[in-house]
A protein has these predicted regions:
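A cross-taxon signal for low-complexity, glycine/charged-rich
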Residues: 3, 7-8
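Hydrophobic alpha-helical segments of integral membrane proteins
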Residues: 14-22, 70, 74-78, 255-262
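A structural signal for short, hydrophobic/glycine-enriched beta-strand patches
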Residues: 59, 64-252
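Extracytoplasmic/luminal low-complexity segments enriched in Pro/Gly and acidic/polar residues
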Residues: 236-242, 249-277
């Protein structure tokens, strides 16, 4: 392997690990629980008063993040950034689906393809492949795990696409990417898009701004096809959550994406802080 390529691989791995660590601490549920535990621990020391305040504040903020509409309020701008794709534009040359919807831990153990809550990233491909029979189908996704790193998402996608009845010769699989940045760069290397070709990018609506920004930075212009909406729209700005877990999951998802946008812009992986159409 050339020295330059080796250096890029090492740098990419370091960024991947650092991003996972930052991602963990970007989630309010993790941060607030950690603060709460610190507060509880301090109550057994001479800083008991400060500990009670820290624990109490963390508990209140957990309630706000979990039960209030806060999660909807911060995910909505992400979801609304790119409008639904306009079919009047005509048939695309190809369709790209990003990983993140396939469970690489459960699937090999259970012997079937297990999907998570982002399943629309995959099911949309079945409909698009039928609607545009001449379009190439590309899936980009290796394994984004540090632990429990098993099969690649691409291998599971191949099985799922076969069950959809998509001809094997239409499909191209990118199985090395571990994050959104690598999705963009590795997919361009695989596809080698020609001038004037139009490609659809299928991913969760809240993930679309960062994904489009990465593909643009890689020199691969794409048309957004957002799926997997978590809100109904502005009406959900007033809708609280019935369970703490659901609200925290929404808040975590949105915060992880906002932090991702900021980090990607800071390190030059996108050219815009909040990419738009």
């Amino acid at each position: 392997m050339p020295a330059t390529s080796a250096g890029m691989t090492i740098a990419g791995t370091m960024f991947f690990i650092l991003a996972k660590i930052l991602g963990f601490f970007s989630m309010p549920s993790n941060v607030l629980m950690a603060l709460g535990l610190v507060g509880v621990a301090l109550t057994a020391s001479r800083f008991a008063r400060a500990g009670r305040r820290i624990a109490g504040t963390a508990l209140i903020l957990l309630g706000v993040a979990g039960w209030s509409p806060f999660g909807n309020a911060i995910i909505l701008p992400l979801e609304e950034r790119f409008p639904a794709w306009d079919a009047a534009r005509g048939a695309p040359a190809g369709i790209i689906s990003l990983g993140g919807a396939l469970d690489t831990v459960v699937s090999p153990v259970r012997g079937e393809v297990a999907l998570n809550e982002a399943a629309e990233r995959m099911t949309a491909i079945a409909e698009l492949a039928r609607r545009f029979p001449d379009a190439r189908i590309v899936f980009s996704g290796g394994s984004g795990r540090i632990i429990f790193d098993g099969v690649s998402e691409a291998s599971l996608a191949a099985r799922l696409f076969a069950s959809f009845g998509i001809a094997k010769e239409r499909i191209a699989l990118e199985d090395k990417s571990r994050d959104t940045d690598e999705n963009g760069r590795f997919t361009k290397e695989l596809v080698q898009p020609k001038m004037g070709e139009r490609w659809l990018l299928v991913t969760s609506a809240h993930h679309m701004p960062r994904a489009v920004g990465v593909f643009r930075a890689a020199g691969f212009p794409v048309e957004a096809f957002p799926v997997d909406y978590r809100t109904r729209g502005a009406i959900d700005l007033l809708r609280p959550f019935a369970t703490l877990g659901d609200g925290l999951r929404r808040t975590d998802t949105a915060m992880r994406e906002w932090v991702g946008l900021l980090i990607y812009r800071m390190v030059g992986r996108t050219d815009e802080l909040f990419p738009a159409p």
